[in-house]
């Protein structure tokens, strides 16, 4: 079998598993031991901390005001996916042409999933590289998936993104704090701390009734996420889940992660 190497393996693998996906593609998953110290030295301490507000209008808004647009991979591919699905439905069951059409549909969906996966990887790596500590809100994804926002929620893939942040933070000695989903991040003024009450989703800006500060809804929420996670003062690189760290979903095996200590 021909293999396309994306990088050199860091160690001799102890086993390899060959996987065939629904789109007819083959992948080889290697199990090997890595040096935890080498991972830690690749990501030196930054002393920076950030809060992240995940959403639909923007994929993420950071506490420093950075807004990351949602790529909307699924919505951009909808016409092509629907066309491929219609062609599949017209083919006779059990025929070779139907199998070809099925593979075409599967590959179209795989292309969307791959693009989303790559976007998550690039953004999560950037955030882990730039920040010693990260705060993110736990989202009720299952509940949102039953609303009119279901397609946008599925397209964003928040759970997979947060999972990447978790395993990369553990691997590279970063601190990741997840705050409760019921924390009133969108209701609280980040300037004075006054809780201003619930606000419908269409309200993108609001003015605090106590101090008069005009807030961008998502930026304000990101600042509150950072504060609620206890990251506002400083990031010190405290120990992050020392020991074995589960590999991400697309990988097999486990990674070693060293404990980190905060300098006095």
Where are these regions (language model features)?
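"…together with the soluble PPM/PP2C metallo-phosphatase catalytic core" -> "…together
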Residues: 1
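Helix/loop segments that flank and initiate small ligand/metal-binding modules
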Residues: 4, 29, 167
């Amino acid at each position: 079998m021909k293999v396309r190497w994306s990088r050199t393996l860091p160690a001799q693998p102890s086993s390899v598993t060959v996987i065939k996906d629904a789109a007819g593609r083959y992948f080889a998953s290697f199990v090997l031991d890595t040096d935890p110290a080498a991972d830690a030295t690749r990501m030196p301490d930054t002393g920076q901390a950030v809060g992240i507000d995940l959403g639909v209008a923007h994929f993420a808004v950071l506490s420093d005001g950075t807004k990351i647009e949602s790529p909307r991979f699924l919505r951009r591919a909808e016409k092509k996916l629907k066309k491929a699905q219609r062609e599949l439905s017209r083919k006779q069951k059990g025929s070779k042409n139907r199998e070809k059409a099925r593979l075409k549909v599967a590959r179209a969906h795989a292309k969307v999933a791959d693009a989303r996966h790559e976007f998550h990887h690039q953004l999560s790596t950037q955030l882990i590289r730039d920040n010693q500590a990260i705060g993110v809100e736990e989202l009720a994804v299952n509940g949102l998936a039953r609303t009119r926002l279901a397609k946008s929620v599925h397209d964003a893939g928040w759970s997979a993104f947060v999972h990447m942040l978790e395993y990369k933070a553990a691997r590279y000695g970063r601190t990741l704090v997840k705050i409760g989903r019921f924390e009133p991040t969108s209701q609280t003024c980040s300037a004075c701390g006054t809780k201003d009450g619930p606000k419908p989703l269409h309200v993108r800006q609001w003015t605090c009734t106590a101090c008069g500060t005009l807030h961008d809804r998502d930026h304000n929420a990101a600042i509150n996420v950072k504060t609620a996670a206890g990251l506002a003062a400083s990031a010190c690189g405290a120990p992050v889940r020392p020991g074995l760290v589960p590999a991400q979903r697309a990988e097999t095996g486990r990674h070693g992660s060293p404990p980190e200590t905060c300098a006095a």
